[in-house]
Structures are given as C-alpha cells and as structure tokens.
C-alpha cells in the first residue's frame, strides 16, 4: 500500500499489518517532510517480509546527504506537526472556497486538491485549460492533465504557505471576473 500522503489523511493502513503477513506499506519523506529531492522513504511490513526486503537492498541505497536531511527532518517533530496541521487547515479552507464558487472538488487526504474549476456556468476542459494558462502566465504553477478525458476538466493544486494560497485565491478571483478567452 502506497501511503505517500498518509500524514495528511485521517486514516492509514498500519493496523492491517497485524492482519496480513504479506502486506507492505511504503511511505516517503518527500511529501509531508518536504524532502522530495532527497528520495528518502521506508517500508513497514512483517519481520519475515522485512528480512526478505533487506536481502534485496543495495549496500548504498541512501546517500549521506539524504540521510542527513532525513535525520534532521525526523528529529524536529514539532516543526513537522505544525507544518502538517497548517497544510491540512489550508487545504480545507481552499476546498470550502472552491465549494462556495461552485467548483467540484474531490475529497482529499493529501497536500493538494483535485478540482474542477467553473466560470460563468462552464466547467469543461476549456475552462480548466484557461485557468491553467492564466495562472501560468502569472507564475503560479498548478498541474493540468488534458491527455485524459476523466481529468481534462480538472486542476491539481498543491497547498503552499498561507501567503502563497492568498495570492492564488486573488488570481483565481481575478480570472473569474474576466471574459472567457476565445
């Protein structure tokens, strides 16, 4: 089970470890600990399964810089908890804002929202593309997935710092008041 975003969710799968000997839960420090560039993670499993995984592990599987970053991040639990709580709070505030604007937003247990923007009654692929381009032109980067019919009307918006989220909302409100682009 991939639990890359488990720290932002209300539930996790750890209790399943005692029920299933063949279960492996993987986690990363990339998301909630903000160590994406260091590629540090870990696995949770039964002792027998950990032994098998350990036999396949490479000798130098985590470099010294990544080890130092991970140790520093893991040793400051207070900062982690404060940051995690802030991200969850900002995510919920943003979701509520989107709800008030009539956007469809998928429930999230991660550090991002997957939302279908709407403007002047239109919430199709052209609307998502238009907002994506509008934000990009203002150096605000969100993810857009036009290659799939299921996702072409949605944007994935990562949760940043409070000031960044304020700027994002200001730009979205500015976009909503503009005429549709041709």
Ranges and model annotations:
Residues 3-32:
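Active-site pre-lysine segment of PLP-dependent enzymes
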Residues 22-99, 103-106:
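PLP-dependent aminotransferase class I/II
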Residues 37, 109, 149-153:
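Short acidic/glycine-enriched loop/turn segments that link adjacent beta-strands
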Residues 45-49, 76, 117-121, 162-163:
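Short loop segments at secondary-structure junctions
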Residues 87-88, 98-138:
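Conserved PLP-binding catalytic core of the aspartate aminotransferase-like
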Residues 134-138, 143, 147-182:
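PLP-dependent enzyme catalytic core of the Aspartate aminotransferase-like
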